[in-house]
């Protein structure tokens, strides 16, 4: 960027989890209504003060899905400049962890994309996507696209 006044003025740290199914051949994605628009992304959210990114994904899984999870490893951290799609004053740093469910599945998984019940603000729907069919164009956000591309290469 040539115009430094256009650069973000703060960092926004986000943490997401790549939750594999029991067979290790599908990952969970989150279809979400954000500001009235539908997006497919990986589950997770913003790191809050006083917590580390791996704690964020555990908290987010409980808040969004009522699902206990265990972080099993680091998967990816953004290694390119990423300006926030929603808040241009923010530069995004996204950290992705691989995870597994603790106990039985507690959330309802949708069979189709954007299976919203009421189409209300911030509604979420979760579904499994086979690694053999995952494509970066399924996702809207640049970091998620990168992770989808990485996941797609795992089955080749």
What are these regions (language model features)?
Residues 82-111:
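Active-site-adjacent beta-strand/loop module that shapes the phosphate/pyrophosphate-binding cleft
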Residues 19, 98-100, 127-130:
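Short, well-ordered beta-strand micro-motif
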Residues 25-64:
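Conserved Nudix-box catalytic region and its N-terminal flanking loop in Nudix hydrolases
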Residues 68-77:
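A short coil-to-beta-strand element that immediately follows conserved catalytic motifs
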Residues 7-11, 39, 87-93, 118-123:
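A generic structural micro-feature
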Residues 1-7, 83-87, 113-116:
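Short, P/G- and charge-enriched loop/turn segments at secondary-structure junctions
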Residues 1-23:
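Acidic, metal-coordinating catalytic segment for phosphate/diphosphate chemistry
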Residues 37-40, 106-107, 112-156:
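Nudix hydrolase/Nudix homology domain
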């Amino acid at each position: 960027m040539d115009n430094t006044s256009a650069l973000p003025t703060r960092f926004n740290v986000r943490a997401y989890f790549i939750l594999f199914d029991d067979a290790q051949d599908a990952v969970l994605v989150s279809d979400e209504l954000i500001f009235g628009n539908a997006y497919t992304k990986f589950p997770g959210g913003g790191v809050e003060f006083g917590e580390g990114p791996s704690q964020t994904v555990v908290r987010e899984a409980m808040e969004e899905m009522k699902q206990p999870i265990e972080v099993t490893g680091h998967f990816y951290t953004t290694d390119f400049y990423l300006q926030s799609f929603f808040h241009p004053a923010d530069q995004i740093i996204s950290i992705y962890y691989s995870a597994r469910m603790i106990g039985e599945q507690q959330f309802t998984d949708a069979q189709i994309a954007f299976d919203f019940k009421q189409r209300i603000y911030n509604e979420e729907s979760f579904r499994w996507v086979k690694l053999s069919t995952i494509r970066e164009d399924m996702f809207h956000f640049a970091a998620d696209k990168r992770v989808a591309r990485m996941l797609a290469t795992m089955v080749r």
